[in-house]
Amino acid sequence: MATQVIMVGEFKILEVNCKPHAPVAAIHVPTQTPKTNDIKWADLEFTLAKSLQRQAHGVVKVDKHGTARIKRASKHHMSCLEQQMADEVAEKEAFMAAPTQLVTSIIFAGTTPPSMMETETIVKKIHTVGKRAKVMRKRSYITPPTDKSLRNHGVTPYSVQQLCRTLGNLSKRTGISLEVVGKTSKATKLRFTKTSFGHMARVQLKHHDGRMHRRDLVVDTSTTTIMQTLFLKTARTNANLDVLTHGSSGLVFWNYLVTGQRMRTRDNFIIVRGRCNGILVDARAKLSESTMLSTHHYSTGDVFWRGFNRTFLENKPINLDHVCSSDFSVEECGSIAALICQSLLPCGKITCRACAAKNLNMDEDTFKEFQTQRAREISAVIISEHPNFACVSQFIDRYFSHQRVLNPNVNAYREILKIVGGFTQSPYTHIQELNEILVLGGRATPEQLGSASAHLLEITRFVRNRTDNIKKGSLALFRNKISAKAHVNTALMCDNQLDRNGNLIWGERGYHAKRFFSNYFDIITPGGGYKQYIERRVPNGIRKLAIGNLIVTTNLEALREQLEGESIEKKAVTKACVSMSDNNYKYPCCCVTLDDGTPLYSTFIMPTKNHLVIGNSGDPKFLDLPADISTQMYIAKSGYCYINIFLAMLVNVDESDAKDFTKKVRDIIVPDLGEWPTLIDVATSCSLLSAFYPATSAAELPRILVDHDLKTMHVIDSYGSLNTGYHVLKANTIRQLIQFASNSLDSEMKHYRVGGTSNSQINGYATIKMLAKAVYRPKLMKEIIHEQPFMLVMSLMSPGILIALANSGALEMGIHHWIREGDSLVKMAHMLRTVAQNVSVARATWVQQEIISDSAQQMLETILNGTIPNVSYFQAIQYLTMLAASKEVDAEVRVTGYYTFKLQTSELLEKNLLEPVGGFMARVKLFWKISSNKTFAKVLHCGYNCCQARKARRLRRNLRYILSVCTGQTDGILQESSLSGCEWIASPIQQHH
């Protein structure tokens, strides 16, 4: 007898004694008469017995409000349980009452021996058209194999069923994936996963891989049979299909255990694909195109998490120092992953293309601001709702705090840019680059930060060098090493300017270069070993060229001796070797030194023929001279070696500008510089040319050697230098040479000679003298009108010359010539003629000067017309500007009550200007007398022999005086001429001398 007790709380409600074979235990009611309380409890037990028994066999259900309740078993269910218990008891009693049996054979794995198998006769079907046979579906049995070889090996339906059950148990326990391969279909993959319904079978569908088909799973009959056996291991739990959602795709449910709207299936199970219009869709059903597109598949999350899990495992760190364990809730980890995604890439849906496009098209600043704001909100959510993930909140705060780093001090950036923006040399360029990086703040890339450190390193080195070099005013630590990199001249790298041999094609530049060679170069006459060209005269001494080494000896010993050259007295680094500005060294304007601080001395420089050599401190570059010029050897005239600098600039001039460039150099630059100008004048001229032709600022300089002993800069041409021991100037380009033009530059070298006298050869006095000659020389005046028309303005320096110019008809001649060229020259001539008429009326010199000064400003406005490549134009502009400014200043001086001495000096100045003109005019007046006397003497030669001696001597004295006045000499000498007929007149004069 077995006793069952039913308890409610702490009270015993019912005690039942059951026999082992009884399906339901009988209720025992005591027969004795109980007391009053016992009777009440007995009645309650009798009343609740059946209800509690049904409740014991009930199931737990959760309603829509989340309340868990016990659903009691139905009466039908209770009767079934009683019948099942009775059957089990009867089966056990029958087994125990059965007689003893002998075991005669043992069969392993439940198979049937071949001897016991019966041969099955296969009856072929008759192919007739008849009614469709009714399909009979069996529940869970596998059809016997028809293959004879399988039957011979003992494969029976029961053995295959056992195999499937064993594999199902293994997959359910380990989670491995199974593949079922049918006769006609592809492999069907399935595995057992743990869900809220228990361990459920999940089939791999096509849409799990992103493939959308009308039939999501294709299986044949044999595959379905095997899958049915495997599905027996699925949890047999009542399920409501209406609660299925994402992640339920591929799950298998038995039809008799589920409730809710679903699609009908041929089998007794359904494979979840998705939901269409509230109806659960089976994966094996063939859908229409529209139904397939409207079906809401339940595998999106599964695909996402499968990719997330795979990528997470592939990229996890391999050098972990501990064994990982599952300490956090998986659901909470999913929430954290979503928050991190929203902080990095804010969006409405992670699969939304519009959100992705919006983030992509947003500018950097706006996106960072939006992203930072979202990160702050998410960080607060993590701290409040997920305290276990404080590390994530810390990461977000640190990461986005760097994103928000901005440089608020924009004013400092502007001030730095104002200070160093105009400098193009180190360290100002490094300061400017560092300033550009610092203003970026958090937007600076790692490469830019590394570049900032490099710029800061260069600034640090500069400050250290400056401190060391300027300390105590000593040059002991001065270093100015030569650049290790050769200068890249882009004009020599363009393929269009080079021939097939890599030589420069001069083009029109070579033709216009003749203006240099014809005016400032001498043609070398070969012969005598070029001895007459070896010594080069300089203002304070000589320098020897290596032109004699063009004749090369084949004796190696003698050749080595020639390569030694002739050394001058070597000078150490002194104050003259450096140039400073604002207490800083201008390194391009200093002499080159070695690593130990000693100067770099020049060595023997080999000569070449017909080359232009450029490249100062680096490796020299040899350019062939233009083809028309290279047929002969040219050498710069004495005092004009600086022409090689302008010739080097011509390399970087466009061919269309070559004519204008060479004319400017010939008509403006060289006349101002003359012979042996100072370096500061040459640098200023280069600056003027680079303003018109910016590309020339990058032109390379010829080699320049510094002679501190003679205070001279030697511009080395292609004939090299035999003398050695000179210092080397570091400046390598025209831009670097222009730095010598600064008045604030503290340098002795800028006053060294490179060519000319200190005063210009073309000045106002020389011009007025030429105008005085041209007044009485029509050919010279015509040449001035054609070539230098603005020279006529210089006649305003002298009222007398201005009147003579107007009376000679030169202004009318100019008007007829200029009327075809432009209005400015014609207006200039009319104004000069008007001023001359007004001046001729005045008697006093100072009144005439006042009339000229009053017209200076108006004439300046008339002729000022941009830049004209003409030396007389600049000279006229300069003179008129001086007159206008002098007029304005004198007026202010007179208003304040002061007196100028200009009135007293005007007559003296006019007298000095007219003195050579007066002598010349006297000689011109006497010219006709000389001509007439010569003719008279020739005609009356015979008649003078009859004259008295006293009259003949008087005639000789008159002729001698006329000749002296005409030639401008006090001791005039009349050369004998067989054509003059004056031998008898010239003879006494020659005897006198």
From Swiss-Prot:
Motif (Involved in virions binding and aphid transmission): 607-609
Site note Cleavage, residues: Y298, S299, G755, G756
Pfam families referenced in this protein's UniProt entry, alphabetically: Peptidase_C6, Peptidase_S30, Potyvirid-P3
Motif (Involved in interaction with stylet and aphid transmission): 349-352
GO function terms (MF aspect): cysteine-type endopeptidase activity; serine-type peptidase activity
GO cellular component: host cell plasmodesma
Annotated ranges, domain Peptidase C6: 633-755
UniProt GO BP: proteolysis; symbiont-mediated suppression of host innate immune response; transport of virus in host, cell to cell; viral translational frameshifting
Transmembrane as UniProt keyword: no
Modification(s) after translation: Potyviral RNA is expressed as two polyproteins which undergo post-translational proteolytic processing. Genome polyprotein is processed by NIa-pro, P1 and HC-pro proteinases resulting in the production of at least ten individual proteins. P3N-PIPO is cleaved by P1 and HC-pro proteinases resulting in the production of three individual proteins. The P1 proteinase and the HC-pro cleave only their respective C-termini autocatalytically.
Residues annotated as catalytic: H207 (for p1 proteinase activity), D216 (for p1 proteinase activity), S249 (for p1 proteinase activity), C641 (for helper component proteinase activity), H714 (for helper component proteinase activity)
Enzyme Commission number, as recorded: 3.4.21.-, 3.4.22.45
Sequence ranges assigned to domain Peptidase S30 in this UniProt record: 154-298
Alphabetic keyword roster: Host cell junction, Host-virus interaction, Hydrolase, Inhibition of host innate immune response by virus, Protease, Serine protease, Suppressor of RNA silencing, Transport, Viral immunoevasion, Viral movement protein
Free-text comment about domains: The N-terminus of helper component proteinase is involved in interaction with stylets. The central part is involved in interaction with virions and the C-terminus is involved in cell-to cell movement of the virus.
UniProt similarity note: Belongs to the potyviridae P3N-PIPO polyprotein family.
The protein's name: P3N-PIPO polyprotein
Organism: Potato virus A
